[in-house]
Amino acid sequence: MAEAVVSFGVEKLWELLSRESARLNGIDEQVDGLKRQLGRLQSLLKDADAKKNETERVRNFLEDVKDIVYDADDIIESFLLNELRGKEKGIKKQVRTLACFLVDRRKFASDIEGITKRISEVIVGMQSLGIQHIADGGGRSLSLQERQREIRQTFSRNSESDLVGLDQSVEELVDHLVENDSVQVVSVSGMGGIGKTTLARQVFHHDIVRRHFDGFSWVCVSQQFTRKDVWQRILQDLRPYDEGIIQMDEYTLQGELFELLESGRYLLVLDDVWKEEDWDRIKAVFPHKRGWKMLLTSRNEGLGLHADPTCFAFRPRILTPEQSWKLFERIVSSRRDKTEFKVDEAMGKEMVTYCGGLPLAVKVLGGLLAKKHTVLEWKRVHSNIVTHIVGKSGLSDDNSNSVYRVLSLSYEDLPMQLKHCFFYLAHFPEDYKIDVKILFNYWVAEGIITPFHDGSTIQDTGESYLEELVRRNMVVVEESYLTSRIEYCQMHDMMREVCLSKAKEENFIRVVKVPTTTSTTINAQSPCRSRRLVLHSGNALHMLGHKDNKKARSVLIFGVEEKFWKPRGFQCLPLLRVLDLSYVQFEGGKLPSSIGDLIHLRFLSLYEAGVSHLPSSLGNLKLLLCLNLGVADRLLVHVPNVLKEMQELRYLRLPRSMPAKTKLELGDLVNLESLTNFSTKHGSVTDLLRMTKLSVLNVIFSGECTFETLLLSLRELRNLETLSFHDFQKVSVANHGGELLVLDFIHLKDLTLSMHLPRFPDQYRFPPHLAHIWLIGCRMEEDPMPILEKLLHLKSVYLSSGAFLGRRMVCSKGGFPQLLALKMSYKKELVEWRVEEGSMPCLRTLTIDNCKKLKQLPDGLKYVTCLKELKIERMKREWTERLVIGGEDYYKVQHIPSVQFINCDH
């Protein structure tokens, strides 16, 4: 539906003109003329979209409109930015600046007239083809934010309620993995959308499976995988604390993984393996010795038998009509108000038949219709399905058009802003886990969402849009069970195909995978019309210097190889809003000074990049909203004192290491919502006083000021939700300092203290809603548990690296009433831990790591009946012997579904 996409751009342009009307004073006639033509154009778009399939000329006109809107936006913003820069050049250049000002205004007026003329020509052309004006329907519709407030009252992201007909299949697969010693490989094969990954995930997390195996790994094998990456991810899952894995070459990885799999019982899941050749590329690490087991999912039915002739090959059945209806009804009814009209069962069942028994299609259709509140709306969807889908049931891999159409319907039903949010997911590679915080910053940087007008944060606004896509079953999400906030999202590969197809159809994105020439394009898309460029290979970095990209608005890079890039500069990308250079290794460690020419930039990331020198021209980027300077930790980074110019910043991550003489003035960054790696050595703590919008703050305390002064500088930060203190010089904090630390932060939920804190504050000094606390290297002499267990809202506690130096720790009856996760790591002096009956009644996960003097698990652990997962890491072999079936302490853990021993002494 191109009309919605084009209309969104037109509306954004109208907003820009209205918002900046005061600064455009003096050229009112040209601006008013442009706005009039935009209004006329808007009224033609709906009819043009309805007739776009009748003639290519209409489609071309719609593409012209998108180009015009982008060009107009670029022209207006460039003028406003250049005018602002002119005002800042000082008195000495006043006369020259005035002359330039007049010239710029005349040129801008001429450019606006040119845009208006182009719109007029499009309008005339459309009308010559019979395109008619259609007035807006009138009546106020709820904004997306208002609709989200309603949705959040009833919408649950719990996918368990969407599972139908899997119980028997899950039990069968579990039996073969756990009980059948003659089977080493189990495969689940079938067409896309039939539920292979869902089934595998249920098996992977099954209580019996978690209990049986010593370790687990889940790796998605995309069509563009590398052998090294797959081996690396498996080994990282099985040895999570081995930091050396990232540096291993293929030969070392192969040897380490082969030896590890020979030594224990491990379950490996390779999800979405496409070809037999893919298996052949990675199979060298899997020993013939029994013990480890493999669960494969693939569309290729013969893959499992190719991997292992004794493989148990399982093919999920499509849902029966009854199961399809049950799943559909469950989704629709769980997301609707009970007072709404009764679902027309006959009409609903007919629509469900077009899903061909595929769970994905049923869930997407259910998510679509759950939002339709009237019989008329249901009839419209029904009519759309009947009109466009031929054939009612029975699908094969060669005949999935009807399923594709069902998935497309959900896209077509999206509001126009959500279409852009959905399109943006096309940037990411297949099976990619998308960090939603980064995704939200992309959306904001491109103006797709605008969180700032009502005081909401980027995170809150982004979540409301993403939840709409989740509710429609267009994306799947991974959320923290501790915070219930979404952390990652992904698309099913069939939905991704829809997303890519629609995004390319609208010229929204150009994807470059492995180019062979500097002019490589995909699907013959015009580089001038695709304003977003995504590189899925580091070998394509040279394309950033290509002249065809001069109108690009975003550049994202994935799959960066370990080699240096020598950029020619960024002159060919003058209109960029988003530039993500994460993991890119710059030759010589220098970011080119031409980065300062990208004056439209809103998002810049150098996360884990090989950069050690930043140019002073960075200060030209006055529109930046997100700046991530979290380069590779090993690098000492020269940062010029120009960040103070970026007064629109909402997110700032500073490098961990900077030269001793570096001083940064940050006091004017009053819009910051998140500030990471703020060092008292390189910045003044008084700069924090005015950052009252901060919700996330990470401070590195290095002794240049007193801790009391630091705390006083934080007193106005009433919106803080996450606060971290890191004292790497181990300066002991006075007792009253610890009390002041948390006294006033009434909204604080997450607290990290990595510092000497010999005396712990009492529970009355902690904020009322504190949910998560990390204590690292605090060297407390008294047991902190009597205080921590009285914090009624605590959900997670992490004690690490000498947080407590005592020998005995006690968790009392009634303590920690809401605690879900407890981790104790590197408590080298702890000998005895006692848990009383009635303590930690809700605990779900417990990790004991490298507490070598701890004699045994507490007897009271047998009373913690909610415990689902126990991890014993880097402990003595005696622990394993005592806790396995038949062991001396087995009775303490026999109720826990998953007990894992990781890197324990052999």
UniProtKB/Swiss-Prot annotation:
The keyword Metal-binding does not apply. LRR repeats lie at residues 573-597, 598-621, 623-644, 646-671, 672-696, 704-727, 740-766, 767-790, 791-818, 840-865. One of its GO terms (biological process) is defense response to other organism. It holds the Pfam family WH_DRP. GO terms for molecular function: ADP binding; ATP binding. Residues 15-68 form a coiled coil. Gene3D superfamilies: 1.20.5.4130, Helical domain of apoptotic protease-activating factors, P-loop containing nucleotide triphosphate hydrolases, Ribonuclease Inhibitor, Winged helix-like DNA-binding domain superfamily/Winged helix DNA-binding domain. InterPro entries: Apaf_helical, LRR_dom_sf, LRR_R13L4/SHOC2-like, NB-ARC, P-loop_NTPase, RX-like_CC, Rx_N, WH-like_DNA-bd_sf. Transmembrane segments: none annotated. Keywords: ATP-binding, Coiled coil, Leucine-rich repeat, Nucleotide-binding, Plant defense, Repeat. Residues 144-454 form the NB-ARC domain. ATP binds at G190, M191, G192, G193, I194, G195, K196, T197. SUPFAM superfamilies: L domain-like, P-loop containing nucleoside triphosphate hydrolases. The LRR repeats probably act as specificity determinant of pathogen recognition. Potential disease resistance protein. PANTHER family: DISEASE RESISTANCE PROTEIN RGA3, PLANT BROAD-SPECTRUM MILDEW RESISTANCE PROTEIN RPW8. Belongs to the disease resistance NB-LRR family. RPP8/HRT subfamily. This is Probable disease resistance RPP8-like protein 2. It comes from Arabidopsis thaliana. The lineage of its organism: Eukaryota, Viridiplantae, Streptophyta, Embryophyta, Tracheophyta. The gene is RPP8L2.
